């Protein structure tokens, strides 16, 4: 019975309450913080679980009263209100029972790179960045460009941005992969539709505790930063390239005039990429056959097509087609895509957990 699956969560919540009131725990700040965090994570589930149990018990009691001459009609009326509540509560609880992704509340580095399609691909990087920026604005998040490499005809060959706010990774983690665009470029005189692509990486930001990179594991090169077309824009060696020797991961930052600032930015990105690389290994070892493997690593996997002539957006992983491309791109109404992706991921997780 579903009720029986709920009891361990309620028991653990009550156990934490007892532990938090014990003098031993009160004197151990780290343990107290850890337990408080666990309890606050369980609270929404326990609240729904108690409501589910109360509702199920009330249904059982009213069913027993159906044959009663005096109370039968009242019991029937109560049941008509209570019975539809149970399946709805069960679905809500199942979502809360899904093991939480420890990275969901983290800020991210968003990395966009031009792929096949030359100049048109670089222009699309700028368009997609604007789409994410507008969505971030709606969500109350803060966007800061970390590094850019300009395209020869506008746009960006590469753009790295930091996005900070509540639940950023939980909303954007399914964006990683290849995004394909089909449209008529401004330079096209015959009106032919061209296809180009960009890759998107969504990397959770990490702190020093999560990733420990030793100084002797990093090789640093400095060079003069260059602008569009390769001309030098700085007379000092302010650009920084960091190489993580154990993994071969390379990060180059040249946006700041100060070498020190570029190094700090590069180190932050490097730590996040090393963390993501470790995360990817774990995912490869443990992930099932889910369509929505987060950051499935294969950046070549085509996840979405943006067809401008038809105003159509298609997400190939879940078979979602929307004829609202202008709304998504110009207004940042990415919820139209993100909400179905999250719902699909939750359904897969519920099935995988056997709930």
From Swiss-Prot:
The protein in question is named Peptide chain release factor 1
Explain the post-translational modification.
Answer: Methylated by PrmC. Methylation increases the termination efficiency of RF1.
Q: Where are the transmembrane segments?
A: none
Q: Name one GO cellular component term.
A: cytoplasm
The encoding gene: prfA
* Residues carrying N5-methylglutamine: 231
What SMART domains does its record include?
A: PCRF
NCBIfam families listed in its UniProt record: prfA, PRK00591.1
Q: Which UniProt keywords apply?
A: Cytoplasm, Methylation, Protein biosynthesis
Where primarily located?
cytoplasm
What is the stated purpose of this protein?
Answer: Peptide chain release factor 1 directs the termination of translation in response to the peptide chain termination codons UAG and UAA.
Q: Which family does it belong to?
A: Belongs to the prokaryotic/mitochondrial release factor family.
């Amino acid at each position: 019975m579903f009720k029986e699956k709920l009891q361990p969560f309620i028991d653990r919540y009550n156990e934490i309450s007892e532990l938090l009131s014990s003098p031993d725990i009160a004197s151990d700040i780290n343990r107290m913080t850890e337990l408080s965090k666990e309890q606050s994570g369980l609270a929404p589930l326990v609240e729904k679980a108690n409501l589910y149990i109360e509702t199920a018990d009330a249904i059982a009691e009213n069913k027993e009263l159906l044959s009663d001459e005096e109370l039968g009609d009242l019991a029937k009326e109560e049941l008509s209100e209570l019975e539809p509540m149970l399946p709805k509560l069960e679905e809500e609880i199942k979502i809360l029972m899904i093991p939480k992704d420890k990275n969901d509340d983290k800020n991210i580095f968003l990395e966009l790179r031009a792929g096949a399609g030359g100049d048109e691909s670089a222009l699309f990087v700028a368009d997609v960045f604007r789409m994410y920026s507008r969505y971030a604005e709606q969500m109350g998040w803060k966007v800061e460009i970390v590094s850019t490499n300009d395209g020869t005809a506008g746009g960006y060959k590469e753009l790295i941005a930091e996005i900070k706010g509540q639940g950023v990774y939980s909303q954007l983690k399914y964006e990683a992969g290849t995004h394909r665009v089909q449209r008529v470029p401004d330079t096209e005189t015959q009106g032919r539709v061209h296809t180009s692509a960009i890759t998107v990486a969504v990397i959770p930001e990490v702190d020093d505790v999560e990733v420990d990179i030793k100084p002797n594991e990093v090789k640093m090169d400095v060079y003069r930063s260059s602008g569009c077309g390769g001309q030098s824009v700085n007379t000092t060696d302010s650009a920084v390239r960091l190489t993580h020797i154990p993994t071969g991961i390379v990060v180059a930052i040249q946006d700041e005039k100060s070498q020190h600032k570029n190094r700090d930015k590069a180190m932050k990105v490097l730590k996040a990429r090393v963390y993501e690389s470790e995360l990817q290994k774990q995912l490869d070892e443990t992930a099932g056959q889910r369509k929505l493997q987060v950051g499935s690593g294969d950046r070549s996997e085509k996840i979405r097509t943006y067809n401008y002539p038809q105003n159509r957006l298609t997400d190939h992983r879940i078979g979602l087609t929307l004829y609202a491309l202008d709304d998504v791109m110009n207004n940042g109404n990415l919820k139209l895509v993100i909400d179905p992706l999250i719902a699909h991921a939750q359904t897969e997780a519920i099935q995988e957990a056997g709930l």
